[in-house]
Amino acid sequence: KAIEAMERLGGKYPIILKTLTGSLGVGVIKVDSESSLHSTVQLLYKLDPNMGVLLQQMVSVDYDIRAHIVGGKYHGAIQRPVVKKDFRSNVSLGSKPSKIELTDLEIEHCERAAKAVDGLWVGVDIFPSKNREKTPPMFIEINSTPGTKGYRKATGENLAKNILIKFKNREIWLKPNTYKSMFDS
């Protein structure tokens, strides 16, 4: 099935394979050929027959952007340069983040992406277009548990603390539990 999915991406290598349970850049693999894809999927299946994977087109860039969307609204973003001698831009792997301002178009698309997954707080990872004012970004992924270390390094803001303060008195936390077990009458 991975080979079929690869062909739907256009059949051009290299591609990126991601495990659905990875984080911090772990589980992100650059695959250079069909035989490498086959071997990688076999290994992952051997480790966990239920492991889900995602295939993505490889895009060569100097950096990506992580936009933090909190409560459906854009909060801020960081630019993450690709790590030297690697293809990933995770802060946990050594990327040196810096604060970046998004265009109105980028903010609109990132907020729409967060709304699509119903995320209270998500990290939307994008590749900016060449004409950032007029052309939408390319989406990499939406992280339901984004890290805050890079954001704090780049901005000095304690994002996690500010999010907790923002959500402290929200109605969502005050709703009664409506779930019942089979033993409840």
Predicted feature locations:
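A short linear hydrophobic-aromatic micro-motif
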Residues: 14-17, 52-55, 121-124
